[in-house]
Regions:
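Interfacial segments of alpha-helical transmembrane regions
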Residues: 5-19, 80-100
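Hydrophobic alpha-helical transmembrane segments
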Residues: 135-150
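Acidic/histidine-rich alpha-helical segments that form the ligand environment
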Residues: 92-111, 115-119
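Juxtamembrane boundary at the C-terminal end of a transmembrane helix
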Residues: 158-165
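Interfacial loop at the N-terminal end of multi-pass membrane proteins
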Residues: 21-66, 112-136
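Membrane-helix exit/interface motif
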Residues: 31-33, 49-53, 70-82, 105, ...
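Core segments of transmembrane alpha-helices
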Residues: 64-75, 146-154
Length: 165
């Protein structure tokens, strides 16, 4: 196996793991974090979500979230260069799923909702009403992120299998 083949397999593996980790994180929010927040008073839920949205912006999360985007972009280019070799289509689909379903969805839908929530005083009646609008919409887009991240991981694992020498 050439060094280029080895590097490609490592890049696919790293990207698949990143997608899987992000999918797991989003799954946790879809499965129980948001449900738990819905069970507590609105003021506490808004305060908790505001805190989560601040704390999540840390080096480790950003390295995983953006690093997976960077490796996905790299795989898109690599898939184009290798076309139509085995695994190229799976690499392209997996990478595109992560970029569209996680990066684009996060930037266009979840982040603006989080920013709007951050501007609210949790003790206000406006915050309570906003919370009831925020949760269903935020969850919907988070489900999209969960499904696309896990699907991207699956496509990339298929690419890993198909691209092996």
């Amino acid at each position: 196996m050439s060094i280029v083949d080895t590097l490609l397999l490592l890049l696919i593996l790293a990207t698949a793991l990143g997608c899987g980790l992000m999918g797991g994180l989003f799954f946790a929010f879809s499965n129980f974090v948001m449900t738990a927040l819905e069970r507590i008073p609105e003021q506490s839920a808004v305060t908790a979500m505001q805190s989560i949205n601040k704390v999540v912006l840390n080096r480790l999360f950003l390295a995983l979230f953006l690093g997976t985007a960077a490796t996905s972009i790299g795989l898109l280019f690599w898939a184009y260069q290798r076309w139509p070799l085995p695994g190229s289509l799976c690499m392209a689909i997996g990478s595109a799923l992560y970029l569209a379903g996680n990066i684009v969805v996060t930037l266009l839908f979840n982040v603006p909702k989080n920013q709007a929530l951050a501007r609210l005083d949790p003790a206000s009646s406006e915050a309570a009403a906003a919370w009831h609008r925020y949760v269903p919409s935020w969850n919907r887009w988070n489900h999209v992120r969960t499904i696309t991240a896990l699907a991207a991981a699956a496509w990339l694992m298929a690419a890993l299998w198909l691209a092996r020498p």
